[in-house]
């Protein structure tokens, strides 16, 4: 995980946080995945940066629908991530 986030990543993370605090409580819990799509997006942006993190987040949100079973779907390890998954 990079120690310094790009300005683009910071903006997107801030937008996700606004969604988490203002919109998500009104909609109620309905994400099919663990972690939630918004948490996944924040982690993907932190781990991969704005371009790849955004792409992973969009792919994840597009999978979050009633025809997909959902389940555990963690963010893939980053290029410098030494943790075992």
Swiss-Prot record:
It comes from the Bacteria. GO terms for cellular component: plasma membrane. GO terms for molecular function: toxin activity. It is a peripheral membrane protein. InterPro entries: Membr_insert_effic_factor_YidD (IPR002696). Pfam families: YidD (PF01809). Keywords: Cell membrane, Cytolysis, Hemolysis, Membrane, Toxin, Virulence. One of its GO terms (biological process) is killing of cells of another organism. It is found in: Cell membrane. HAMAP family: UPF0161_YidD (MF_00386). Could be involved in insertion of integral membrane proteins into the membrane. Lyses fish blood cells. Belongs to the UPF0161 family. NCBIfam families: membrane protein insertion efficiency factor YidD (TIGR00278). This is Putative membrane protein insertion efficiency factor. It comes from Aeromonas hydrophila. The lineage of its organism: Bacteria, Pseudomonadati, Pseudomonadota, Gammaproteobacteria, Aeromonadales. The gene is hlyA.
